[in-house]
């Protein structure tokens, strides 16, 4: 599945790379919300996808933090 490959890619990244990816995803979500509010967003399901990706990134960061302890 597509999500499994995405999670595997995330798990291969370092913590700093994950944090950079998280910041980029949050910026994208911010922009998507503004586009949605101004009726410029055609694909509204993209908001849901980005939110789920943010959760996946945060989960991998949490797993790496627990493994480090």
Curated annotation (Swiss-Prot):
Q: Identify the taxonomic lineage of the organism of origin.
A: Bacteria, Bacillati, Bacillota, Clostridia, Lachnospirales
Key words, A-Z: Ribonucleoprotein, Ribosomal protein
Q: Which family, according to the similarity comment?
A: Belongs to the universal ribosomal protein uL29 family.
PANTHER family in the record: 60S RIBOSOMAL PROTEIN L35/50S RIBOSOMAL PROTEIN L29, LARGE RIBOSOMAL SUBUNIT PROTEIN UL29C
What GO terms are given for molecular function?
structural constituent of ribosome
What is the name of this protein? Large ribosomal subunit protein uL29
Q: What processes in GO biological process is this protein linked to?
A: translation
What Pfam families is this protein classified in? Ribosomal_L29
Source organism, top-level taxon: Bacteria
CDD domains cross-referenced by the UniProt entry: Ribosomal_L29_HIP
InterPro entries named among the record's database cross-references: Ribosomal_protein_uL29, Ribosomal_uL29, Ribosomal_uL29_CS, Ribosomal_uL29_sf
Cellular component terms, GO, for this chain's entry?
cytosolic large ribosomal subunit
């Amino acid at each position: 599945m597509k999500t499994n490959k995405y999670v595997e890619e995330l798990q291969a990244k370092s913590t700093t790379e994950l944090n950079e990816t998280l910041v980029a995803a949050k910026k994208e979500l911010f922009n998507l919300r503004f586009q949605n509010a101004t009726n410029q967003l055609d694909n509204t399901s993209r908001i849901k996808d980005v939110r789920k990706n943010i959760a996946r990134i945060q989960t991998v960061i949490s797993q790496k933090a627990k493994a480090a302890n």
